Amino acid sequence: MSENAQLNGLCDRFRGFYPVVIDVETAGFNAKTDALLEIAAITLKMDEHGWLMPDETLHFHVEPFEGANLQPEALAFNGINPHDPQRGAVSEYDALHAIFKMVRKGMKESDCSRAIMVAHNATFDHSFTMTAAERAGLKRNPFHPFVTFDTAALSGLALGQTVLSKACIAAGMPFDGAQAHSALYDTEQTAQLFCEIVNRWKRLGGWPLPVATPE
């Protein structure tokens, strides 16, 4: 494989990390006590020229775990009725088991050693995902235990905006406020935003890194 082809590979772009975009909707801010209600995940891939793009998607409504807190303010904010049978909710175990399986498959195909979570204000999504995985007894968690790519920080650097909707608009992307706070829609927008920031850096000449030539 040529050096150029290697640099256009996903594993070499992020030092062996496999980026996966995640968004969660919850019944509060405390990952240990408040319910995880919805989660979506989108894997990413690179074409032969090194341009990053969304790949596979999974989306689940999630049943609150036994004894979970359901904060009324959080439910009013995201508009989720946890008791609605039409949600088709699944257990935390089933949702995360399916997502982790998809992620591990993508890691293997991309020759990556570890998944890294991409999320907007990533500490929140990371904490709920990792806590739910531990609570569900899932042993093969592919995500790095603390390293993330936070699109709020990246957007502040690249676009001068930190709010997801404003960052998307600044990047030239449409944003439908009526669909915001759906885990699927927010994950789709975050994935497109992350890809645009990474690809914009490439277009500006920031990647591949210049190779120092001996004098």
Curated annotation (Swiss-Prot):
One of its GO terms (biological process) is tRNA processing. The active site is at residue 181. Keywords: Exonuclease, Hydrolase, Magnesium, Metal-binding, Nuclease, tRNA processing. The record marks 29, 77, 124, 146 as: Important for substrate binding and specificity. Mg(2+) 1 binds at residue 23. GO terms for cellular component: cytosol. Binds two Mg(2+) per subunit. The active form of the enzyme binds two Mg(2+) ions in its active site. The first Mg(2+) forms only one salt bridge with the protein. Coiled coil: none annotated. Its cofactor is Mg(2+). It holds the Pfam family RNase_T. Mg(2+) 2 binds at residues 23, 25, 181, 186. SUPFAM superfamilies: Ribonuclease H-like. It comes from the Bacteria. NCBIfam families: RNaseT. Trims short 3' overhangs of a variety of RNA species, leaving a one or two nucleotide 3' overhang. Responsible for the end-turnover of tRNA: specifically removes the terminal AMP residue from uncharged tRNA (tRNA-C-C-A). Also appears to be involved in tRNA biosynthesis. Homodimer. Belongs to the RNase T family. This is Ribonuclease T. The gene is rnt.
